[in-house]
UniProtKB/Swiss-Prot annotation:
Stated name of the protein: Prolactin-inducible protein homolog
InterPro entries: Ig-like_fold (IPR013783), Ig_E-set (IPR014756), PIP (IPR007990)
Species annotation: Gorilla gorilla gorilla
Positions bearing Pyrrolidone carboxylic acid: Q29
Disulfide bond residue pairs: C65-C91, C89-C123
Chain's gene name: PIP
Description of how the protein assembles with itself and partners: Monomer. Interacts with AZGP1.
């Protein structure tokens, strides 16, 4: 019985070791990679029928490449190259920047959408992954027409 009590009694050194291991495990869990990092840039305001350039910069922290399709959606129809859809291979060492030129004659809300898709012939050797958790990312901006 006494031997059993000695086995189950924790020494201060053991408790300190367990605490350090627990703190180290929590720090490791916080170090997750971001699937998509996006920066959508459009002017805040323009005059009616001025040409607008929208810029979407996309990158990833994943070690594997992904096939992404990017496009814009608006609250009202717009003229120009607004409806262009881009498909590209996105890797951590090769961020992508996409451009759209269009005309706006009234205030509009614009969403830049990034879909992670499965498509052959885009990434080298067709080596690409699709995230399980999320495969659609977006950001919105308002373009004021004065």
């Amino acid at each position: 019985m006494r031997l059993l009590q000695l086995l189950f009694r924790a020494s201060p050194a053991t408790l300190l070791l367990v605490l350090c291991l627990q703190l180290g495990a929590n720090k490791a869990q916080d170090n997750t990679r971001k699937i998509i990092i996006k920066n959508f840039d459009i002017p805040k305001s323009v005059r009616p029928n001025d040409e607008v350039t929208a810029v979407l910069a996309v990158q990833t922290e994943l070690k594997e490449c992904m096939v992404v399709k990017t496009y814009l959606i608006s609250s009202v129809p717009l003229q120009g190259a607004f409806n262009y859809k881009y498909t590209a291979c996105l890797c951590d060492d090769n961020p992508k920047t996409f451009y759209w030129d269009f005309y706006a004659n009234r205030t509009v809300q614009i969403a830049a959408v990034i879909d992670v898709i499965q498509e052959l012939g885009i990434c080298p050797d067709d080596a690409a992954v699709i995230p399980i958790k999320n495969n659609r990312f977006y950001t919105t901006e308002i373009l004021e027409v004065e």
